[in-house]
């Protein structure tokens, strides 16, 4: 196991900056998830740590050693890819032992590591099969097994579940989290799927445009997004972002420079509320039933701003209904559009 430090890490492709001065410390045994939209730099950053991309500037330290210019094979890191990267002509056992044989690990040690990995991942019955004889989930477990047998200082996961169907992704998320906790190996995991990120991470690193927008536990990032981007990216349905002048009056003042308000769909309550609440009237345009909740698409009166409210299905609404809504002031997220940041920084 090892701590990983990224110090002002940058990556340029010619004149184009892709990763813009990343500073991050991953504690020994921690699971960090890098999450963000396509093109935000998260996979490039992971490949820089792995040594598959040359670092333009900055420092990368693993266990206190600067490894920015060390060959990938000598960084003691194991990577799990989206496409499994298994040799199709080899059996599962041969795939697991291939890297160890190249490193001249003794045969008895190879056998021990394969047996341990097969036991942890429950792939013992597949050892003599070839990848084409396995399901997608089984192939991904073999790919993780190949990483485990290396006994690395850290795991790097590059969107490993993207090729799996929704049901299998849920199961594999649980397996990866269980495995990481069991092995206590420092891990960095890249995904664009926020649900995957929220369920796996000890801490989230939300990226956008090659920069870090926010670092925090999943609960911290969800409850208190620090930027407009994070507010709109984390959460499903996403947070409603509304210009302050599009909302009705309230007897409570917002922090200075607030001109944009974020409201989680679940924070919108039906009914008039009290004078202390933020209140507005709206028309129901569309109702989506999602399990025990309805995502109700609303158009705020006068402003014509469209928002989403999540309400229980036992609240009987019809499209074209006109309803009153209220939000507790404590549930509002105040932002400034120019800076893109919260205005209640001291709270």
From Swiss-Prot:
Gene Ontology biological-process entries: carbohydrate transport; glycerophosphodiester transmembrane transport
Membrane-spanning ranges: none
InterPro entries per record: AAA+_ATPase (IPR003593), ABC_transporter-like_ATP-bd (IPR003439), ABC_transporter-like_CS (IPR017871), ABC_transpr_MalK-like (IPR015855), ABC_transpr_MalK/UgpC-like (IPR047641), Mo/tungstate-bd_C_term_dom (IPR008995), NA-bd_OB-fold (IPR012340), P-loop_NTPase (IPR027417)
Signal peptide bounds: none
Binding residues annotated for ATP, in chain numbering: 36-43
SUPFAM superfamilies per UniProt: MOP-like, P-loop containing nucleoside triphosphate hydrolases
Location of the ABC transporter domain: 4-234
Membrane topology recorded in Swiss-Prot or TrEMBL: Peripheral membrane protein
Record flagged with keyword Isomerase: no
Alphabetical UniProt keywords: ATP-binding, Cell inner membrane, Cell membrane, Membrane, Nucleotide-binding, Sugar transport, Translocase, Transport
Coiled coil ranges: none
Catalytic activity: sn-glycerol 3-phosphate(out) + ATP + H2O = sn-glycerol 3-phosphate(in) + ADP + phosphate + H(+)
Cellular localization per UniProt: Cell inner membrane
Domain of life: Bacteria
Record GO terms (molecular function): ABC-type glycerol-3-phosphate transporter activity; ATP binding; ATP hydrolysis activity
Listed EC numbers: 7.6.2.10
GO cellular component: ATP-binding cassette (ABC) transporter complex, substrate-binding subunit-containing
NCBIfam families referenced in this protein's UniProt entry, alphabetically: PRK11650.1
Stated family: Belongs to the ABC transporter superfamily. sn-glycerol-3-phosphate importer (TC 3.A.1.1.3) family.
PANTHER family xref list: MALTODEXTRIN IMPORT ATP-BINDING PROTEIN MSMX (PTHR43875), SN-GLYCEROL-3-PHOSPHATE IMPORT ATP-BINDING PROTEIN UGPC (PTHR43875:SF12)
Cited function: Part of the ABC transporter complex UgpBAEC involved in sn-glycerol-3-phosphate (G3P) import. Responsible for energy coupling to the transport system.
Subunit structure: The complex is composed of two ATP-binding proteins (UgpC), two transmembrane proteins (UgpA and UgpE) and a solute-binding protein (UgpB).
Name under which the protein is recorded: sn-glycerol-3-phosphate import ATP-binding protein UgpC 1
Lineage: Bacteria, Pseudomonadati, Pseudomonadota, Alphaproteobacteria, Hyphomicrobiales
Gene this protein is translated from: ugpC1
């Amino acid at each position: 196991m090892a701590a990983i430090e990224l110090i002002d890490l940058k990556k340029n492709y010619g004149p184009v900056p892709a990763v813009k001065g990343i500073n991050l410390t991953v504690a020994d045994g921690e699971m960090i998830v890098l999450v963000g939209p396509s093109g935000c730099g998260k996979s490039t950053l992971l490949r820089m740590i792995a040594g598959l991309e040359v670092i333009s500037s900055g420092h990368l330290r693993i266990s206190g050693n600067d490894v920015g210019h060390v060959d990938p094979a000598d960084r003691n890191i194991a990577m799990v890819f989206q496409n499994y990267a298994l040799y199709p002509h080899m059996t599962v056992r041969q795939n697991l032992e291939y890297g160890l044989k190249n490193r001249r690990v003794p045969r008895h040690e190879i056998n021990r590591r394969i047996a341990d990995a097969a036991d942890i991942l429950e792939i013992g019955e597949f050892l003599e099969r070839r990848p084409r004889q396995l399901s997608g989930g089984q192939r991904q477990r073999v790919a993780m097994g190949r990483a485990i047998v290396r006994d690395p200082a850290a795991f790097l996961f590059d969107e490993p579940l993207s090729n799996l169907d929704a049901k299998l992704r849920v199961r594999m998320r649980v397996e990866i989290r269980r495995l990481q906790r069991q092995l206590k190996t420092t891990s960095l995991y890249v995904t664009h799927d926020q649900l995957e990120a929220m369920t796996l991470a000890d801490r989230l690193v939300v990226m956008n445009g090659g920069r870090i927008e926010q670092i925090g536990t999943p609960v911290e990032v969800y409850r208190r997004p620090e930027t407009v981007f994070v507010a709109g990216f984390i959460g499903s349905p996403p947070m409603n972002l509304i210009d302050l002048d599009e909302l009705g009056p309230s007897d409570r003042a917002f922090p200075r420079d607030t001109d944009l308000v974020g409201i989680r769909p679940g924070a919108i309550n039906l009914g008039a509320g009290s004078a202390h609440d933020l209140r507005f009237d709206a028309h129901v345009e569309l109702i989506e039933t999602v399990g025990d909740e309805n995502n109700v698409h609303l158009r705020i009166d006068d402003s014509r701003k469209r928002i989403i409210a999540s309400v229980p299905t036992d609240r009987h609404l019809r499209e074209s209904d006109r309803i009153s809504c209220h939000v507790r002031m404590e549930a509002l997220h105040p932002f400034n559009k120019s800076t893109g940041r919260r205005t209640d920084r001291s709270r």
